[in-house]
């Protein structure tokens, strides 16, 4: 019995590791939009048309924005919209159409105590959080991914361009995004 359960688990794990590509047609206007690929691994949120990071609401939720990547172990299908893929691309990602020529703030969180995954394991590591901002240009393709260099969480943003049959990458300058200030109403009215 144990051997059969182990075989079923091994087969499920093997199949979960096979990323599929779900290609979606997204409304994309090169004159007003940009595209961005976000790699899985760290919890990642987009905040549109702001250079600061909105405050989270009750229990860590809210603050607007959009969750674009979360660590996951079961649903590993990529969502693609036709962006070029560089040779060094990670295996699992989602792609999005975003407004160009407006600031995009990206927050990334990694670590901390997490809930048990489907195997019953609990992963614990130091909680790290960063937020960065940049202005995507119209008609350009980007990718964003977290890295952990020197035990410090980093956000990397690269611009993609196709030259001949190759996809080239170029680092994009990003700035720290502070927490947004809560504006209190003026008591004088």
Language-model regions: role of each:
Residues 18-127, 131-133, 141-189:
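Short loop/turn and low-complexity linker motifs enriched in small/turn-promoting residues
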